[in-house]
């Protein structure tokens, strides 16, 4: 492959785009790899398309290695298949929905579990046909409310989605592990620093689920690791260790106190510590009750839900939404409070919730025998020593409180610390959610039907491109790993004398030896501009054909390390070939 910048469809930019927030967005646009078409929608230009296809090639190789077979299904999908599994409503506003001229409903596919299940159902009938793994690399669509960060969170994106079909759970476990190992090889080859974390399944359904997160401070996903073990989990999947229950006998009676002007935890704690109650109070002694409303998929009516968490914790809406998925969750508005006058803002307690049959879920730390300070359901009043299991009984527990550095690890080994990452892969053991919906059976060896079990596995191919840039760049530009770079070597002819002609000759010799070359043969462009573009574009090896040519030498630069060396023009082709081939 020989790309000549004199006729390459490429314009580099010196300034960051106005809407760019993260390095990958800035550099991919400045380098002419992508261009914004609409919010969350990007066009891939020649160099970007090459990088995208290089990532896809690595994914294909490793998927084929585990025996997966590539297919291509439509992106335009009929409503009825997604209605059969409930995802037409579960996905809510994130689905792109449309009608054809006859009024039939369609969607643009976010994932393809339904279609793959029906595809296999239409082709396979016997146990002898299984197991099978199918995959595709295709554009997906999600109507993100706030598309941001360039191609990191877009409305249209490239994704590899694969699906395994097995006769039993043991087979599913083997397929799941095969994918897990394939993903490890893929991300290792791509040079990414990543972590594998426990995750929730959300609208996908199923049981076991893990995410592959590229470690980056700009990532949208918060995950935790343990100081004492290899435990790692997405913050949404962290399970709070519950303390042991405590005896109730002998605990002080609950008493209501007049606590004027104390609608916040801070003001309440300050008041109590100056009220002469004979002990010191902290925010952790209080029980904060947060009101939300939930709505099941397809339902019109909202239901009230009370969430009780220790007062020194905030409610993490992502954790709350994950715990209640697939239901929709929203905070109460003025109209809601007006409709339910028993909800006294700033002073809500379990009493009014239970008296009015409002479901009440609490943090796992709220166990029988624990005493709390909480709202007395009356303005300017709180109750002290309200004991769980004696004075109130919650309807259950929920993971909704924020996770903090220093929290005990769920496995009992060490404490947690948080970091941020970019989700680049996700693997699910779906089980039989989709095969039940479409009655996907195989005729077993005994002549009886066997319900097939499924796995679902995704890699965000376009997001991987951005994740690589997030991890591999400097103040001058991108630093591509050789496996995905748009070229193996960037040859720069500085433009004086016969330097461009020699650069073109060396480039052709390299191409003849199987090296991918990007050559800057532009005339009328200063050496400084060419060097700046070479650093911005990030090809791992840069060859400068410049002033040293008069002495029979050229300069090799390593984009990552910055190392430079002079090489004889007569041996430079062999040197580069050996470098590229490792």
From Swiss-Prot:
Subcellular location as annotated: Cytoplasm
InterPro entries from the UniProt entry: aa-tRNA-synt_IIb, aa-tRNA-synth_II, aa-tRNA-synth_II/BPL/LPL, Anticodon-bd, Anticodon-bd_dom_sf, Pro-tRNA-ligase_IIa, Pro-tRNA-synth_IIa_bac-type, Pro-tRNA-Synthase_IIa_type1
Molecular function terms from GO: aminoacyl-tRNA deacylase activity; ATP binding; proline-tRNA ligase activity
Gene: proS
Cellular-component GO terms for this entry: cytosol
Protein name, entry field: Proline--tRNA ligase
Family: Belongs to the class-II aminoacyl-tRNA synthetase family. ProS type 1 subfamily.
Species: Thermobifida fusca (strain YX)
One GO BP annotation of this record: prolyl-tRNA aminoacylation
Function as written in the Swiss-Prot or TrEMBL entry: Catalyzes the attachment of proline to tRNA(Pro) in a two-step reaction: proline is first activated by ATP to form Pro-AMP and then transferred to the acceptor end of tRNA(Pro). As ProRS can inadvertently accommodate and process non-cognate amino acids such as alanine and cysteine, to avoid such errors it has two additional distinct editing activities against alanine. One activity is designated as 'pretransfer' editing and involves the tRNA(Pro)-independent hydrolysis of activated Ala-AMP.
Catalytic activity field: tRNA(Pro) + L-proline + ATP = L-prolyl-tRNA(Pro) + AMP + diphosphate
Record note on quaternary structure: Homodimer.
Main location: cytoplasm
Superkingdom of source: Bacteria
Domain comment as written in the entry: Consists of three domains: the N-terminal catalytic domain, the editing domain and the C-terminal anticodon-binding domain.
EC annotation from Swiss-Prot or TrEMBL: 6.1.1.15
Enzyme class: ligase
Keywords attached to this entry: Aminoacyl-tRNA synthetase, ATP-binding, Cytoplasm, Ligase, Nucleotide-binding, Protein biosynthesis
């Amino acid at each position: 492959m020989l790309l000549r910048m004199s006729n390459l469809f490429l314009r580099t930019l010196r300034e960051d785009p106005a809407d760019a927030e993260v390095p990958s967005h800035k550099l991919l646009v400045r380098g002419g790899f992508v261009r914004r078409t609409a919010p969350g929608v990007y066009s891939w230009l020649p160099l970007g398309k090459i990088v995208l296809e290089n990532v896809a090639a690595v994914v294909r190789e490793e998927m084929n290695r585990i025996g997966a077979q590539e297919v291509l299904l439509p992106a335009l999908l009929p409503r009825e298949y997604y209605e059969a599994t409930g995802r037409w409503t579960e996905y809510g506003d994130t689905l792109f929905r449309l009608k054809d001229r006859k009024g039939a409903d369609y969607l643009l596919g976010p994932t393809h579990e339904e279609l793959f299940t029906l595809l296999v159902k239409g082709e396979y009938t016997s146990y002898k046909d299984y197991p099978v793994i199918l995959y595709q690399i295709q554009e997906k669509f999600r109507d993100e409310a706030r598309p941001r960060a360039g191609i990191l969170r877009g409305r249209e994106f490239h994704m590899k989605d694969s699906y395994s079909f097995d006769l039993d759970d043991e087979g599913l476990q083997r397929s799941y592990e095969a994918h897990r190992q394939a993903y490890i090889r893929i991300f290792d080859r791509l040079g990414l620093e990543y972590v594998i974390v426990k995750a929730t399944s959300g609208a996908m359904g199923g049981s076991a689920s893990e995410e592959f997160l590229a470690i980056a401070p700009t990532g949208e996903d918060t995950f935790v690791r343990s100081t004492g073990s290899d435990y790692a989990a997405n913050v949404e999947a962290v399970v709070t260790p519950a303390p042991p229950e405590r005896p109730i006998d002998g605990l002080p009676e609950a008493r209501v106190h007049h606590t004027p002007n104390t609608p916040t935890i801070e003001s309440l704690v300050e008041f109590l510590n100056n009220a002469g109650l004979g002990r010191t109070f902290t925010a952790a002694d209080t029980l904060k009750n947060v009101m939300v409303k939930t709505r099941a998929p397809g339902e019109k009516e909202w239901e009230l839900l009370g969430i009780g968490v220790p007062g020194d914790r905030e409610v993490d809406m992502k954790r709350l939404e994950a715990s209640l998925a697939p239901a929709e969750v929203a905070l109460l508005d003025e109209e809601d409070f007006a409709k339910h006058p028993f909800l006294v803002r700033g002073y809500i307690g379990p009493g009014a919730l239970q008296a009015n049959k409002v479901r009440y879920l609490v943090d796992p730390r709220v166990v029988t025998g624990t005493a709390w300070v909480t709202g007395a359901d009356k303005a300017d009043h709180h109750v002290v020593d309200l004991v769980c299991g004696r004075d109130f009984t919650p309807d259950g527990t929920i993971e909704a409180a924020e996770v903090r550095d220093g929290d005990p690890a769920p496995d009992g080994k060490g404490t947690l610390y948080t970091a941020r990452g970019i989700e680049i892969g996700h693997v699910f053991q779906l089980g039989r959610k989709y095969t039940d919906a479409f009655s996907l059976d195989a005729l077993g060896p005994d002549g009886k039907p066997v319900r097939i079990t499924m796995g679902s596995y995704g890699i965000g191919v376009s997001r991987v491109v951005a994740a690589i840039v997030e991890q591999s760049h400097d103040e001058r530009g991108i630093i591509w790993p050789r496996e995905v770079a748009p070229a193996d070597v960037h040859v720069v002819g500085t433009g004086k004398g016969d330097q461009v002609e020699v650069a073109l000759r060396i480039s052709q010799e390299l191409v003849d030896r199987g090296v991918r070359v990007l050559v800057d043969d532009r005339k009328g462009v200063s050496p400084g501009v060419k060097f700046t573009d070479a650093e911005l574009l990030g090809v791992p090896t840069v060859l400068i054909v410049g002033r040293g040519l008069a002495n029979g030498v050229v300069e090799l630069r390593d984009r990552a390390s910055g190392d430079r060396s002079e090489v004889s023009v007569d041996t430079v082709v062999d040197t580069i070939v050996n470098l590229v081939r490792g």
